[in-house]
């Protein structure tokens, strides 16, 4: 019985807070019940002067433990039981509008249900302000605290009901009602269709969340308002994720898609995405990217499991911030088609462009200086390419994927790189290929052997394609010099004059 004391005191205080009930030490079940207080543990231990039975009579106490509930609950409940026709409970209730002709037969109540229903009636009459859910919780807690002797009357009542139920419905078999599955099926179908089309906003927000600025602000991305029609079920509550969470997993949670095995995020298929829709979001939010720290989220070899020839698609998918920012929709495919069959005019020897350039010593210049004169990166690009003519085309693909950290530099240096960069497909992320710091600065990121080890067998490919890069062809891949975001008029100047245009479009402050 003493088990109950702390709980009774707790419910007391609750009750004082809720109703200011006049009887402070009686539990909510009996306070206000008209019965004389039986020798329940609470009143017994705290207010002995109110008890009808003296505290020192163990026989009476034992008898009351078996027959009475603490704090007069038993008496209150028995009053309810007397006045309540329990045979009504299991009787068939006709289901309106149901296709079945058979009425639904409820299960017989178990002991807890008997207790809860009776006590709820009593308490609801006494404390109409009590919230039903709170009442249920309290009744459940009290039931768990009762000992066997206290539960016995309810167990017996439940047994009686069960026997009665069996007489009334001899062939009764419990069949839980099936939930109507129509809505669930529709919802699943909708989710399936939603997952096939990924809205550009969702992609951009997923990318933005990888930026270090929003690592603590990732909760903004998952906040319910920002789920752009993709979350299944209730939106994820905003949480501040652990810093060591894998970015792939975070993206997937944010985009509401199930995580495949291994936790790796599959590359987004951009055929379904209108790249033009991205640009406004990207331009307005481009300041939030911390260019230099962005590399830490990258796998060492670009996207695992993606063939290198898909570099353009993958690149715009995962880091398409800069390249898609200023492009009209579909530009990427135009560039790809041009590149796939490059006309091979061999007028110029392979080494011709690098000849007048500066020596490659500035290669070790820190990449954090986006304001370096554009002529330098041009020199780096050329010397890198010409001094390693035996290396493969893949080299530069991988380099591009390895460091998408050049968002700010790209706008300033892209013209020079464009002149010599279109070696193969992946460089045509729309409107200008972003080969920037990672090419002339590859020594900062990894030793160069890792770049060239995976593509040793294709030396001639680089060498031959390099011949196509004569000045006559350069205008085909002109950078964006105007601010409209459309590829501008071909510029036939020599590379030295390409520094003039001022690229104010997306540079960070």
Swiss-Prot record:
GO terms for molecular function: chromatin binding; cis-regulatory region sequence-specific DNA binding; DNA binding; DNA-binding transcription activator activity, RNA polymerase II-specific; DNA-binding transcription factor activity, RNA polymerase II-specific; RNA polymerase II cis-regulatory region sequence-specific DNA binding; sequence-specific DNA binding. One of its GO terms (biological process) is regulation of cell population proliferation. Residues 30-41 have a biased composition (Low complexity). A motif (9aaTAD 2) lies at residues 290-298. Keywords: Acetylation, Activator, Differentiation, DNA-binding, Isopeptide bond, Nucleus, Phosphoprotein, Transcription, Transcription regulation, Ubl conjugation. Acetylated; acetylation impairs nuclear localization and ability to transactivate expression of target genes. Deacetylated by SIRT1. A motif (9aaTAD 1) lies at residues 275-284. It comes from the Eukaryota. There is a cross-link at residue 398 (Glycyl lysine isopeptide (Lys-Gly) (interchain with G-Cter in ubiquitin)). It is found in: Nucleus. Residues 341-376 have a biased composition (Pro residues). The modification Phosphoserine is found at residues 64, 211. It holds the Pfam family HMG_box. One of its GO terms (cellular component) is protein-containing complex. Residues 1-67, 160-273, 334-415, 479-509 are annotated as: Disordered. A motif (9aaTAD 3) lies at residues 460-468. The transactivation domains TAM and TAC (for transactivation domain in the middle and at the C-terminus, respectively) are required to contact transcriptional coactivators and basal transcriptional machinery components and thereby induce gene transactivation. PANTHER family: SOX100B, TRANSCRIPTION FACTOR SOX-9. This is Transcription factor SOX-9. It comes from Callithrix jacchus (White-tufted-ear marmoset). The gene is SOX9.
